[in-house]
Amino acid sequence: AQMSHQYYVTDEIPELAAREFPLPLLRDPDTSYYLRQERNSYILGPYEWQATAMWRDGIPDHFANMLWSEDLERLETQILDASERVPVLGEAGIARVVNGPIPYAPDGNPYMGPERGLRNFWHCNTFSFGIAQGGGAGKAIAEWVLEGRPEFDIWNIDRRRYKDYATTQYTIDKAVEVYQNEYA
């Protein structure tokens, strides 16, 4: 399922520009957001509890880097909490808001492997944590394609772990649940 995921980037913050080293990533599992430095700005990326699944009938044919309208009201709790924790965040203006698709499998894990009935068609998607799993996934999919199987047991990310029970509605319902509890 494709979830609507928003984050915003602040205007430049002089205190960040004055630092020699970037600040570490901050994740708040209770309020469900991440905050990280992006050059001389912050990125605040919540996993809001009012999760919204998009494209229930599949990705549109015309999709190409498409974004949706911002909906900062959905992020109000996380914005207020993060601004209290890091006061300079609340003082900074917002340079831009990004509201785009982030794919989720029903269990929150990647979805990889050969497609049944389609020769040389491979899935390698639903990496909800961005590049964090990229190296291992790249190694596994390359071994799978070139050698017939990955070096390690990767059943927990193999697309074949889902059977007939995984209908479109099931997939959407579980993806929403996983997204809402990303840091739970």
Per-range role (PLM):
Residues 4, 48, 98:
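Residues at the C-termini of beta-strands that transition into short coil/loop
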Residues 33, 37-48, 55:
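Beta-propeller blade termini and top-face loops
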Residues 1-18, 77:
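Central beta-strand plus flanking loop segment that forms part of the substrate or channel wall
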Residues 12-15, 38-40, 49, 115-116:
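Short loop segments at secondary-structure junctions
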Residues 11, 36, 45, 113, ...:
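Residue-level detector of conserved, well-ordered beta-strand and adjacent loop positions
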Residues 19-21, 55-56:
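Short, charged, solvent-exposed linker or helix-capping segments at domain edges/interfaces
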Residues 1, 30, 39, 53-54, ...:
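C-terminal catalytic lobe of FAD-dependent flavoproteins
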Residues 10-14, 20-38:
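Phosphate/diphosphate-binding loops
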